[in-house]
Amino acid sequence: MTFKELNITEPILKAIEEKGYTVPTPIQEKAIPVALAKKDILGCAQTGTGKTASFAIPIIQHLHLNKGEGKRSEIKALILTPTRELALQISECIEDYSKYTRIRHGVIFGGVNQRPQVDMLHKGIDILVATPGRLLDLMNQGHIRLDNIQYFVLDEADRMLDMGFIHDIKRILPKLPKEKQTLFFSATMPDTIIALTNSLLKNPVKIYVTPKSSTVDSIKQLVYFVEKKEKSLLLISILQKSEDRSVLIFSRTKHNADKIVKILGKAGIGSQAIHGNKSQAARQSALGNFKSGKTRVMVATDIASRGIDINELPLVINYDLPDVPETYVHRIGRTGRAGNAGTALTFCSQEERKLINDIQKLTGKKLNRADFAI
């Protein structure tokens, strides 16, 4: 399957080919035809799957084919995303694929002067990429109306909830027209997300794309069977002996991530936590410190960790096991990138043993047991 076979129009196809892409990713192959057919989508996909293009390309195409001559642009598509970084990434993607069309787009987010954003809105745009807080601010000030929205994208919905944006979203939704196409994407599907999709989507086409388990084959994987109360001692012991420059530790909850940082601090090991309760500035600062090597150890929840993209990450530690085996694959896929060696260590308590079996079923690989003495 090629992009040409997905019935993408010439100006957009030209832009895609200029970027060096000819074959769509699995989610693009599944989602683009559905979105072009104007059906609602419930997409379950991680970042790094080509998800952004799977909603950006159909929206650009619809708007391009229906663009009136000489009329001032008004917002026809709204893309809501949780963070400034994601908003900018989506904006760049739209910029790339719409370059040979007359589609105008803009991006708004908090933490910066709103004046340039307001000026851009007043000039007229077709597609708006926004974070919930800044969108509500500018709506309340009368700078944005959502009456003409035909396409609505809610991206990284689980991360939105994790960061406490659910109330903002519930204030935005009633301002949207009833008749619109909704494209909803989330990496995980907890009950709160399912409840939201039930109220938002009309007969959606469900699209699931799981991470390739083959990507874990090159990573050395070991499991430590350990009592829950011994996990912190084991972690300290490993970090004190390890010479790895960067270590990423996964915790299932925000509370536990903070607790791990405190425990390590008492043992003289500096670390930082990144999760949804941290402010955007704090998350950015922690990420910057980790990427630059200023912070050696990062403790993260699954949702917050999506902003971490480092080629040289030699060691990943699963302090808690994830409930979903695909998440394990996604976690350990952070190491062993770009031909570098990678190791993934997993701490498994008695009550987590079933989860290990689920992981081994998914990957088709038995995890080697590691022995230890604390």
Regions inferred by a protein language model and the residue ranges of each:
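Conserved helicase RecA-like core
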Residues: T2-I374
